[in-house]
């Protein structure tokens, strides 16, 4: 974490030695137009006026060592927030999170908005992938983005009323009035289901054109979940397509405002339901930043060990289902059997299989069981042989290679423009793995390589990178097995939740703390924190705001699959329907990760 508390006479925290980009910004814009915000995010956060958004973002994207990727864009309802000392007056805030690969650095631009003038210009002309993020921000907060090409609902149904992430909006179903389906409501709902190509941005280029429209999904086996793609076809050729998401939306960010810091942990498992403990990591680390908790080394290694086991399991499922999409039926049945062996290890350690909810604020739920080394040893001896079997039997098959090579291809520029992370980005030749570039939880102490591609990310290079990542995860697990630190499985920090059982049985104060933290939740100091990790499908992160309460004031979950699906039309236009199936299988996504 970087300290940016030292203010100069202009009221702007000038820490130019730490953030060289400030020198560049102040050479073009007046420093009085910037307000720096100190947080626990470890990221430079700057507040600017709304009329400066496009000039500032354009400058950041085109400067030397540019902030080339729009990583995230969303909003905050500030109206009930108490701890806002030193920040500009704001009822609602829009934030833009940019990443510079060359600098290995981030910057967050925040724009304050008042309720009576809740609008801002779209930045789609600067960052193409802002399109979906702005649509989601509009439908969740009611913030209007001027000149947006298609400002319509994206997550919620078309006939939905209200803005769910506003503070006055109910957080529980029981807070709504009883549902009554009137004839008028039914007619509106049915009308919303009518397909009108113009409403989806699909148009004829001339009056003589006569294209066919086809719904792929939302219940097609090759769309990997409840996901619909509307195709505009000229024969078998895809002229245009529009992804239709939101069927799996559960309001995960809204739930974060009603659950305690501790009781929200099970929800993190279900954001991307195949990742298990991998999904718990960014949330737990972000909360620990807010609480000021440093965990023991044993906790760090245990967390890495569980994360890599889940990574291998997720990759095995991805590889086998992708092969099934292409036409090879046997691998998926074999892989499900193989994955159970890894689940056996996970269950022996955590007590659960897919959704363990096992990480804790300040540690893990309990220590490793006796005999865990033998279980892991047997698993590590077996995994490489099985992966080698899949490679030799199918992935190196000439028929499969001809079917996958060159399909769904894009270069590094396209990947960065659309916010692609994970194997899709690394296949373009960019070595950007958060475990290496920005180590967390002790990854800096592990020896492993980051597989990258040769410049073009296509349906074959992406799956082969996942294979190499399995081998690297095995290397990491070998080091966990050989170098597991001795020590406690939980920090003795007062905000570690729940506290160590041994202390609670001996000290009445600790017993009271246990009761309060588990029932009401720990009171986390007011601040903002952020943590990104290398998840199974790309970069996943949590941006948390605490207002000094037992629950999060704002929980922003950025998942990798959301931008990956937004990229589909750009990549697949001009291809065949059969190529789309191959491309979809190579992305590696689940709809819970998209819709949250």
From Swiss-Prot:
One of its GO terms (molecular function) is NAD binding. InterPro entries: NADH_DH_suC (IPR010218), NADH_DH_suCD (IPR023062), NADH_Q_OxRdtase_suD (IPR001135), NADH_quin_OxRdtase_su_C/D-like (IPR037232), NADH_UbQ_OxRdtase_30kDa_su (IPR001268), NADH_UbQ_OxRdtase_49kDa_CS (IPR014029), NDH1_su_D/H (IPR022885), NiFe-Hase_large (IPR029014). Disulfide bonds: none annotated. It catalyses: a quinone + NADH + 5 H(+)(in) = a quinol + NAD(+) + 4 H(+)(out). One of its GO terms (cellular component) is NADH dehydrogenase complex. Residues 210-596 are annotated as: NADH dehydrogenase I subunit D. Residues 1-186 are annotated as: NADH dehydrogenase I subunit C. Transmembrane segments: none annotated. PROSITE patterns: COMPLEX1_49K (PS00535). It is found in: Cell inner membrane. It is an enzyme of class 7 (translocase). Its EC number is 7.1.1.-. Pfam families: Complex1_30kDa, Complex1_49kDa. It is a peripheral membrane protein. Keywords: Cell inner membrane, Cell membrane, Membrane, Multifunctional enzyme, NAD, Quinone, Translocase, Transport, Ubiquinone. In the N-terminal section; belongs to the complex I 30 kDa subunit family. In the C-terminal section; belongs to the complex I 49 kDa subunit family. NDH-1 shuttles electrons from NADH, via FMN and iron-sulfur (Fe-S) centers, to quinones in the respiratory chain. The immediate electron acceptor for the enzyme in this species is believed to be ubiquinone. Couples the redox reaction to proton translocation (for every two electrons transferred, four hydrogen ions are translocated across the cytoplasmic membrane), and thus conserves the redox energy in a proton gradient. NDH-1 is composed of 13 different subunits. Subunits NuoB, CD, E, F, and G constitute the peripheral sector of the complex. This is NADH-quinone oxidoreductase subunit C/D. The gene is nuoC.
């Amino acid at each position: 974490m970087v300290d940016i508390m030292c203010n100069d006479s202009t009221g702007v925290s000038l820490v130019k030695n730490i953030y060289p980009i400030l020198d560049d910004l102040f050479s073009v814009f007046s420093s009085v137009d910037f307000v720096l915000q100190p947080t626990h995010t470890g990221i430079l956060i700057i507040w600017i006026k709304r009329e400066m958004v496009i000039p500032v973002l354009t400058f950041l994207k085109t400067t030397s060592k540019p902030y080339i990727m729009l990583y995230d864009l969303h909003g905050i309802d500030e109206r009930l927030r108490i701890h806002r000392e030193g920040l500009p007056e704001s009822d609602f805030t829009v934030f833009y999170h940019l990443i510079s690969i060359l600098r290995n650095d981030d910057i967050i631009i925040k724009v304050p908005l008042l309720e009576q003038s809740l609008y801002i210009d779209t930045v789609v002309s600067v960052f193409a992938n802002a399109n979906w993020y702005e649509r989601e921000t509009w439908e969740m907060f009611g913030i209007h983005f001027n000149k947006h090409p298609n400002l319509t609902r994206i997550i919620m149904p078309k006939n939905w009323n209200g803005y769910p992430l506003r503070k006055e909006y109910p957080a529980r179903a029981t807070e709504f009035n009883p549902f009554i389906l009137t004839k008028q409501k039914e007619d509106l709902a049915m009308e919303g289901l009518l397909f009108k190509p113009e409403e989806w941005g699909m148009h004829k280029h001339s009056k003589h054109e006569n294209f066919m429209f086809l719904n792929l999904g939302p219940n097609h086996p090759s769309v990997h979940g409840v996901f619909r793609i509307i195709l505009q076809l000229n024969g078998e050729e895809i002229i245009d397509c529009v992804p239709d998401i939101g069927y799996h939306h559960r309001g995960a960010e809204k739930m974060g405002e009603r659950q305690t810091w501790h009781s929200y942990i099970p929800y993190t498992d279900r954001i991307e339901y195949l990742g298990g403990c991998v999904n718990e990591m960014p949330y737990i680390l972000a909360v620990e930043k807010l609480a000021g908790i440093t965990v023991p080394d044993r906790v760090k290694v245990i967390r890495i060990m569980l994360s890599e086991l889940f990574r291998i399991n997720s990759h095995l499922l991805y590889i086998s289902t992708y092969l099934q999409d292409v036409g090879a039926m046997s691998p998926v049945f074999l892989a499900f059997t193989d994955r159970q062996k890894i689940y056996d290890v996970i269950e022996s350690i955590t007590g659960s299989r897919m959704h363990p909810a096992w990480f804790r604020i300040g540690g893990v739920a309990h220590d490793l069981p006796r005999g865990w080394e033998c279980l892991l040893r047997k698993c590590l001896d077996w995994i490489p042989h099985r992966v080698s079997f899949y490679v030799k039997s199918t992935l190196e098959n000439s028929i499969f290679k001809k079917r996958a090579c060159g399909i769904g291809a894009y270069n590094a520029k396209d990947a960065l423009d659309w916010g692609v992370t994970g194997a899709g980005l690394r296949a373009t030749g960019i070595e950007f793995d958060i475990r290496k570039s920005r180590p967390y939880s002790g990854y800096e102490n592990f020896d492993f390589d980051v597989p990258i591609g040769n410049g073009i990310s296509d349906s074959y290079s992406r799956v082969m990178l996942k294979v190499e990542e399995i081998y690297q995860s095995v290397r990491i697990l070998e080091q966990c097995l050989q170098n597991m630190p001795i020590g406690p499985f939980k920090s003795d920090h007062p905000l570690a939740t729940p506290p160590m059982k041994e202390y609670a049985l001996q000290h009445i104060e600790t017993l009271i703390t246990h009761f309060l933290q588990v029932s009401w939740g720990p009171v986390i100091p007011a601040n903002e924190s952020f943590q990104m990790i290398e998840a199974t499908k790309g970069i996943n992160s949590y941006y948390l705001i605490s207002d000094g309460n037992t629950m999060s004031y704002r929980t922003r979950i950025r998942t990798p699959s959301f931008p990956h699906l937004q990229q589909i039309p750009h990549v697949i236009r001009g291809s065949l329907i059969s190529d789309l199936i191959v491309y979809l299988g190579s992305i590696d996504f689940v709809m819970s990760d998209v819709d949250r």
